[in-house]
């Protein structure tokens, strides 16, 4: 009999209950007991949702981040929080956010307290994890309380649970040695703690543990391969069964290694590695389980179940009970339940599957394999009809858009002049000081803004009333910026619910959910739009708002756009054509908007490419092809303007030392980047590469509520000036300020502007 299991379930709740519970707790409006009770209630519900599985995951729930959870399980707390009094939950949030709940007096390290842990992308997804921190003298100690508590809950609910833990080698690989020591040198100290954890779970009657080593789908050198072998040979002696889980890609040159590791089962991402399944089935020892990730855990399209059965049936005959079925990866990356989407177009809705629907697909596949297709014939017929509807729909295919993409040539991506000529023209037009100050785009989304948007969508506020409310918020943002004496202003994006969804709502070829939320980090959730068809722009999307904002000030007002690569990477993207084609379609639409902004008199236009790096394939051998079309798409979008129009781009969470040449090829006049959490480490890229244009290294971490001091910002910019000529440096935050409160934003920006003035004075005086 084929078994079913799941690698992980969305933790935020179908209605974002975890998000709101966390924020109530952080704001002092909920107690610790109320927060922990909410977590327990969500786990109970999620296990109930997975009751038809043979094995449900346990330990996939986290209050902030599962990698941070693993750090606490292993006793690996950053040194800066070890001396704080209070319990583990206090320290947990200190590492995640820079402060515990209810502790407004705690500030970042720049201000005498604790800095939030560095945050970066989880492989090539839009989820972010807190980076484990290591030193040569790091020690580990087991704290199994989180897993044991959840195991007790699962047992009380009579759930057949499979604990999920991050594997030791991936854990080290994901982390950062703060003293540049060798992370792998810690493996001998780490493995006994993993062994003790497995022994603890064995003593509790656990049969299977899922141990995730997704680095097996990346390019590994000999040391990391040797570490994997060492780790699993050391853990082999434990009396518990290990399911080694890989996901997000193909094993390729690691396939032989994965097969040879002494574990009891191996999970493979069969969505991306379908052509490796047969080889694995032949190569695995005759007692080993092969778990096949046959359902896409990262996208929301329905599975073609009949096509899946065509290749699963021979596999089931070959492997019998050694075949397990699962999603390709954790369902953390998809929304919870399509049944909530009552306002979504019925035809498009019929093409989709969220987490609960994917589990139903899993059950249907297992039933067909175990009992025959005839037992689920009606469900298979309905699935086939939906697949065919999508394939043939004229809503998906637009001949005019396809023709426009076919006409793209290299000239479309080129500026009229090289950067030095453009810089001179822009300097004459903009007349900015040294160390010009700006922000990245958004200002706080206040309760008043959210209420106006809610009432407008509910029909309680007419369009004129909504525009009046948004104009008032835009004017407030402009006046605050003028008072702060910022040099290049933004309109604050009051009218935007999300930097991708806002544009998708105005593009043909997109659809939108009401409850399609997924976790980005902590309490931050995003609702990716659904790119289902060919993309076109029926009319201008931002010009009216930016033109109004510019009318309020004589200072330059930035037009704010999201770039084609980021819109693509932060959407649920159609899987029936290459991603590059969809990206070129988006680029043409954004290009039209850029030119409309320029015609409206906008002198500075920012095209955010926050997600450029996250689209990189996990294997470097595949990077050149991706970077070619991604950079081409940005250039198509940006480069139709005059020399004296200044193009900015922004990247957040982007470690791009290894793609700096490609970043330069974008040829943006100004690039702003996230650097503060890494203490300007990202600027190491400029030690060996002379970046030709202007750059704004982020000088404070907007993801933390802590207020940076003027002195701290000056210090960071001095570091930046060691690598970038001061004449080409901008001063700006790391990211947009949407998630912060005005009470946090105003003092932070006050200090930032004061720091810029200090830097100008130092430069004039030759300091």
Curated annotation (Swiss-Prot):
Q: Which CDD domains match?
A: CIMS_C_terminal_like (cd03311), CIMS_N_terminal_like (cd03312)
> Would the keyword GTP-binding be found if you checked this record's keyword annotation?
no
Can you tell me which residues bind L-methionine?
Answer: 440-442, 493, 608
Which EC numbers does the record give? 2.1.1.14
A Pfam family per the record:
Meth_synt_1
The record ties this protein, via InterPro entries, to: Cbl-indep_Met_Synth_N, Cobalamin-indep_Met_synthase, Met_Synth_C/arc, UROD/MetE-like_sf
**How cofactor binds (record note)?**
Binds 1 zinc ion per subunit.
The positions annotated for binding Zn(2+) are 650, 652, 674, 735
**Cofactors, names only:** Zn(2+)
Alphabetically sorted, this entry's keywords are:
Amino-acid biosynthesis, Metal-binding, Methionine biosynthesis, Methyltransferase, Repeat, Transferase, Zinc
Which catalytic residues are annotated?
703
Catalysed reactions listed for this entry: 5-methyltetrahydropteroyltri-L-glutamate + L-homocysteine = tetrahydropteroyltri-L-glutamate + L-methionine
So where does L-homocysteine get bound? 440-442, 493, 608
Record pathway: Amino-acid biosynthesis; L-methionine biosynthesis via de novo pathway; L-methionine from L-homocysteine (MetE route): step 1/1
- Quote the record's binding site residues for 5-methyltetrahydropteroyltri-L-glutamate: 16-19, 121, 524-525, 570, 614
| Superkingdom per UniProt | Bacteria
Gene Ontology terms describing biological process: methionine biosynthetic process; methylation
Descriptive protein name? 5-methyltetrahydropteroyltriglutamate--homocysteine methyltransferase
Can the keyword Plastid be found in this entry's annotation?
Answer: no
What family is it from?
Belongs to the vitamin-B12 independent methionine synthase family.
Q: What does this protein do?
A: Catalyzes the transfer of a methyl group from 5-methyltetrahydrofolate to homocysteine resulting in methionine formation.
